[in-house]
Amino acid sequence: MNRSPKPSAPPTLDRIAELGVVGAGGGGFPAAVKLAARVSTVIVNGAECEPLLHKDKELLQHLAEPMLRGLAAAMALTGAREGIIGIKEKYTAVMAGLEPLLPPNVRILPLSDTYPAGDEFLLVHDAVGRIIPPGGLPKDVDAVVANVETLANIGLDRPVTHKYLTVAGAVAAPVTLAAPIGTSIGELIARAGGAAADRIAVLLGGAMMGRLAASLDEPVTKTLGGLIVLPESHPLIERYKATPRQIARIGRSACDQCRFCTDLCPRFLIGHPIQPHLAMQSLGFSTSPTSMAAGTLYCCECNLCSLYSCPENLDPKNVCVASKPAARERKLEWKGTPDSIAAHPLAGDRRVPTKRLIAKLGLAGFRNVGPLEDLGAAPRRVVLPLKQHAGAPAAPVVRPGDRVAAGDLVAAPAAGALGARIHASISGVVRSVDGAVVIEA
């Protein structure tokens, strides 16, 4: 399953940047930049709280050794004294398999099967008991958080050319695959036995925090963790198709101010100044589709308020998101101090069980499995977007007509710019470099 021999020495920050390693959990932040921090704890995010996705759990079983090598490298680079691996407590076999491999300064943190257990603010609070300040980063509380796959990529010590992801939902055989970056999502659906509905829509990244795919030709990127395939008529797809104006108009007329959206908000429960019900309330006093409620900047966009908490099926999350640019412009920022933040006394009791969330989303009828399997034959064509990471797009270093081998550098960030290198995921000929490097075998 895409294994490699053990590297002779831990990788340096320059080596990690050279390999093109970025946050594989969705953020895409360059790993070499993150690991330049000095902290006491490195936390491995293996919570994987998005419904129906199994990628991280499968990697903890099949790529445990490279992941632990990556963790050791991350701890050495940051000066961390402790490593903590967050895993859902229900995965007892995964934890049992990991335990014998752990060094004395690394421990497993069993996590509740709730959503969003994988939010790094919640994970840090669970792991070390400290609350990241609003707008802050884990390093502000002496920690670094890295995804399982990110650390495995560091431990494998080779250019990042493949992405692990789960294909789930309305497919014949849900599966987790290692796909060459740039593979079309349509090819992955075919590898999962094909769609189990005539007309489908695909959520890229997950049911809660994903986005609708524009077409089945969209490529796999370094940050894509899963595909949720659903019938086009599924209620969840209808929710994702709503326009900002529809969201604001309906929210303005139908919100009953029950404040369930705030009472269950994960960030509110750790003391952050985000109260989605106030954002909804402010819609009633404005003709704009955006809200002026202070605190919307600190919405983590987990979508729990919109897709679970609200009894009226309104969309507080997108109301908060729509207001963020105006809130930044007006500098509606948190003015508190770190020691003024405290978790809600009922925070632990208000966590949402994943099983209940799956039922509310209308996903209970789909198989909740995703075994790791080989993709099979490599695609004949890949599309490598120049922007699949945090920071500026990479600049191509190849031209149409160039022949490349898998692992060759095809794009790189400008000197001094935040970005990541991109490597060929298949061998072939470069056909174009406009916005993406297209390679055909």
Predicted feature descriptions by range:
Residues 81-187, 191-198, 206-208:
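Hydrophobic alpha-helical positions that pack around
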Residues 43-56, 171:
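Gly-rich Lys/Arg/Thr-decorated short loops/hinges at beta-loop-alpha junctions or inter-strand turns
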Residues 42, 61-78:
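Histidine-anchored nucleotide/phosphate-binding helix
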